[in-house]
Protein backbone atom coordinates (compact mmCIF):
# COMPACT_ATOMS: atom_id res chain seq x y z
CA UNK A 1 0.00 0.00 0.00
CA UNK A 2 1.40 3.36 -1.06
CA UNK A 3 1.11 5.67 1.95
CA UNK A 4 2.28 8.66 -0.09
CA UNK A 5 -1.05 8.91 -1.91
CA UNK A 6 -3.10 9.14 1.30
CA UNK A 7 -1.49 12.28 2.69
CA UNK A 8 -3.51 15.45 3.01
CA UNK A 9 -2.23 18.14 0.68
CA UNK A 10 -2.06 21.67 2.07
CA UNK A 11 -1.79 24.53 -0.41
CA UNK A 12 1.11 26.94 -0.42
CA UNK A 13 0.69 30.61 -1.33
CA UNK A 14 2.25 30.09 -4.77
CA UNK A 15 -0.07 27.19 -5.64
CA UNK A 16 -3.32 29.17 -5.31
CA UNK A 17 -5.17 29.84 -8.56
CA UNK A 18 -7.68 32.63 -8.05
CA UNK A 19 -10.38 33.17 -10.65
CA UNK A 20 -12.89 35.97 -11.19
CA UNK A 21 -16.61 35.15 -11.24
CA UNK A 22 -19.65 37.32 -11.95
CA UNK A 23 -23.05 36.75 -10.35
CA UNK A 24 -26.22 38.63 -11.30
CA UNK A 25 -28.19 39.24 -8.09
CA UNK A 26 -31.45 40.26 -9.76
CA UNK A 27 -34.40 38.78 -7.80
CA UNK A 28 -32.20 36.44 -5.75
CA UNK A 29 -32.96 35.98 -2.04
CA UNK A 30 -30.42 37.86 0.11
CA UNK A 31 -29.44 35.10 2.57
CA UNK A 32 -29.21 32.32 0.00
CA UNK A 33 -27.05 34.47 -2.27
CA UNK A 34 -24.82 35.60 0.61
CA UNK A 35 -24.26 32.02 1.77
CA UNK A 36 -23.16 30.88 -1.69
CA UNK A 37 -20.96 33.96 -2.21
CA UNK A 38 -19.26 33.41 1.17
CA UNK A 39 -18.58 29.80 0.13
CA UNK A 40 -16.89 30.94 -3.10
CA UNK A 41 -14.92 33.71 -1.36
CA UNK A 42 -13.64 31.18 1.16
CA UNK A 43 -12.75 28.62 -1.56
CA UNK A 44 -14.81 25.81 -0.06
CA UNK A 45 -16.17 24.90 -3.50
CA UNK A 46 -12.68 23.82 -4.61
CA UNK A 47 -11.08 20.44 -3.88
CA UNK A 48 -7.88 22.24 -2.84
CA UNK A 49 -9.53 24.15 0.05
CA UNK A 50 -7.13 25.06 2.83
CA UNK A 51 -8.74 26.60 5.95
CA UNK A 52 -5.98 29.07 6.83
CA UNK A 53 -5.33 30.40 3.30
CA UNK A 54 -7.13 32.84 1.02
CA UNK A 55 -7.78 30.27 -1.71
CA UNK A 56 -11.20 31.54 -2.82
CA UNK A 57 -12.14 33.40 -5.97
CA UNK A 58 -12.78 37.09 -6.55
CA UNK A 59 -16.54 37.63 -6.81
CA UNK A 60 -18.24 40.44 -8.73
CA UNK A 61 -21.94 40.88 -7.98
CA UNK A 62 -24.02 42.93 -10.39
CA UNK A 63 -27.45 44.44 -9.65
CA UNK A 64 -26.86 44.17 -5.90
CA UNK A 65 -29.63 46.73 -5.39
CA UNK A 66 -32.18 44.31 -6.88
CA UNK A 67 -31.63 41.61 -4.27
CA UNK A 68 -34.84 40.33 -2.67
CA UNK A 69 -35.82 39.83 0.97
CA UNK A 70 -38.65 37.45 1.80
CA UNK A 71 -41.71 38.41 3.80
CA UNK A 72 -41.79 41.87 5.37
CA UNK A 73 -38.08 41.92 6.21
CA UNK A 74 -37.45 44.99 4.05
CA UNK A 75 -39.31 47.11 6.61
CA UNK A 76 -39.42 44.92 9.75
CA UNK A 77 -35.81 43.65 10.01
CA UNK A 78 -33.63 45.94 12.13
CA UNK A 79 -29.86 46.37 11.91
CA UNK A 80 -28.33 47.62 15.17
CA UNK A 81 -25.04 49.49 15.47
CA UNK A 82 -23.44 51.58 18.18
CA UNK A 83 -21.51 54.82 17.78
CA UNK A 84 -19.38 54.16 20.85
CA UNK A 85 -20.84 57.06 22.81
CA UNK A 86 -23.37 56.79 25.65
CA UNK A 87 -26.87 56.52 24.21
CA UNK A 88 -25.36 55.94 20.79
CA UNK A 89 -27.35 52.88 19.74
CA UNK A 90 -28.67 53.37 16.19
CA UNK A 91 -31.29 51.30 14.37
CA UNK A 92 -31.96 51.05 10.64
CA UNK A 93 -34.01 48.87 8.31
CA UNK A 94 -32.80 47.34 5.03
CA UNK A 95 -35.02 49.81 3.18
CA UNK A 96 -33.27 52.79 4.83
CA UNK A 97 -29.81 51.34 4.25
CA UNK A 98 -30.51 50.55 0.58
CA UNK A 99 -31.78 54.09 0.02
CA UNK A 100 -28.39 55.47 1.13
CA UNK A 101 -26.05 52.74 -0.16
CA UNK A 102 -27.73 50.03 -2.29
CA UNK A 103 -24.94 47.46 -1.97
CA UNK A 104 -24.40 47.66 1.81
CA UNK A 105 -27.11 45.17 2.87
CA UNK A 106 -25.56 42.45 0.71
CA UNK A 107 -22.04 43.31 1.92
CA UNK A 108 -23.14 43.02 5.57
CA UNK A 109 -24.86 39.68 4.89
CA UNK A 110 -21.78 38.19 3.22
CA UNK A 111 -19.41 39.60 5.86
CA UNK A 112 -21.48 37.98 8.61
CA UNK A 113 -20.97 34.58 6.96
CA UNK A 114 -17.17 34.87 6.76
CA UNK A 115 -14.72 34.06 9.57
CA UNK A 116 -14.45 36.70 12.30
CA UNK A 117 -10.65 37.03 12.14
CA UNK A 118 -7.88 38.49 9.97
CA UNK A 119 -8.60 36.00 7.20
CA UNK A 120 -12.24 37.10 7.08
CA UNK A 121 -11.16 40.74 6.85
CA UNK A 122 -8.94 39.82 3.91
CA UNK A 123 -11.63 37.74 2.20
CA UNK A 124 -14.26 40.51 2.21
CA UNK A 125 -11.87 42.58 0.07
CA UNK A 126 -12.30 39.97 -2.71
CA UNK A 127 -15.98 40.92 -3.02
CA UNK A 128 -16.92 43.60 -5.56
CA UNK A 129 -20.50 44.88 -5.44
CA UNK A 130 -22.17 47.05 -8.08
CA UNK A 131 -25.69 48.43 -8.07
CA UNK A 132 -25.90 48.50 -11.86
CA UNK A 133 -25.26 46.08 -14.69
CA UNK A 134 -21.73 47.31 -15.49
CA UNK A 135 -18.39 46.60 -13.83
CA UNK A 136 -14.81 47.78 -14.51
CA UNK A 137 -13.21 44.31 -14.29
CA UNK A 138 -13.41 43.21 -17.94
CA UNK A 139 -9.61 42.84 -18.12
CA UNK A 140 -9.76 39.95 -15.62
CA UNK A 141 -11.99 37.91 -17.99
CA UNK A 142 -14.53 36.92 -15.32
CA UNK A 143 -16.80 33.97 -15.97
CA UNK A 144 -20.52 34.31 -15.32
CA UNK A 145 -22.04 31.77 -12.95
CA UNK A 146 -25.45 31.17 -11.41
CA UNK A 147 -26.20 30.07 -7.86
CA UNK A 148 -26.87 26.51 -8.99
CA UNK A 149 -23.35 26.18 -10.44
CA UNK A 150 -21.63 26.83 -7.11
Residue ranges and their predicted role:
Residues 106-107, 111, 124:
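Hydrophobic, well-ordered secondary-structure segments
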Residues 1-108, 118, 136-150:
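Ribosome large-subunit tunnel/peptidyl-transferase-proximal elements
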Residues 120-130:
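C-terminal structural segments of small proteins and small subunits
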Residues 129-137:
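Short, highly charged C-terminal tails/helix-capping segments
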